[in-house]
């Protein structure tokens, strides 16, 4: 991966985070797809048996910003730290996951654990690769707690019931995410 000017990487993540913040406010995640190259790959782990994989901007729009965000209207994902590697053109962003409902103290309910995204920049203000990471057990417990309290959207309850039948979910044995990492340091 070629090096990119640090200022360009800083501007890219600034633009992306600003758009992410707007999407959280209005619930329209679709516009984030414009930040991905036509052949970008976006993945995350879904526990011990599954990975989520979207290949190309169309699948990212349809699945990441579509089916995977259904029921999460008005949830916000504020970024609290970004780390930039301008030699590899990569950025790691650490974020929180906040529900649009409050607890008994009036604070937004938060999914515990650490959430983050690892991006590879390809120039032209587009990501070519993204790998998200978050605490699956905290997410599951948080969503279940919200559902039991009647604070989870009906759409999200439906999604939880569908489990691994969501588009983009593949068995871990069928997808090697490490193989998608360019310029690995363990090779």
Label every model-predicted segment:
Residues 29-92:
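A solvent-exposed, acidic/Ser-Thr-rich amphipathic alpha-helical stretch
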Residues 1-34, 38, 172-187:
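Short, low-complexity N-terminal intrinsically disordered segments enriched in polar/charged residues
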Residues 2, 10-11, 38-42, 60, ...:
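A generic structural signal for ordered alpha-helices
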Residues 3-4, 68-187:
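A beta-strand edge to alpha-helix "cap/lid" segment located at domain peripheries
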Residues 11, 15-18, 34, 62, ...:
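Charged/polar, solvent-exposed surface patches and flexible loops
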Residues 13-20, 24, 36, 60, ...:
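Hydrophobic alpha-helical core bundles mediating ligand binding, dimerization, or RNAP-core interactions
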């Amino acid at each position: 991966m070629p090096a990119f000017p640090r200022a360009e990487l800083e501007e890219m993540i600034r633009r992306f985070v600003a758009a992410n913040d707007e999407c959280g406010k209005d619930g329209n995640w679709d516009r984030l797809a414009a930040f991905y190259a036509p052949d970008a790959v976006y993945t995350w782990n879904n526990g011990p048996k599954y990975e989520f994989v979207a290949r190309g901007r169309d699948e990212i729009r349809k699945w990441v910003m579509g089916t995977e965000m259904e029921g999460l209207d008005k949830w916000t994902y504020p970024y609290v730290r970004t780390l930039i590697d301008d030699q590899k053109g990569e950025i790691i962003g650490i974020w929180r996951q906040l529900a649009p409902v409050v607890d008994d103290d009036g604070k937004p309910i938060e999914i515990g654990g650490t959430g983050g995204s690892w991006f590879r920049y390809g120039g032209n203000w587009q990501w070519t690769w993204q790998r998200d990471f978050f605490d699956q057990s905290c997410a599951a417990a948080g969503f279940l707690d919200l559902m039991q309290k009647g604070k989870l959207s009906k759409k999200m309850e439906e999604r939880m019931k569908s489990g691994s039948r969501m588009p983009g979910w593949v068995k871990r044995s069928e997808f090697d995410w490490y193989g998608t990492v360019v310029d690995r340091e363990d090779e």
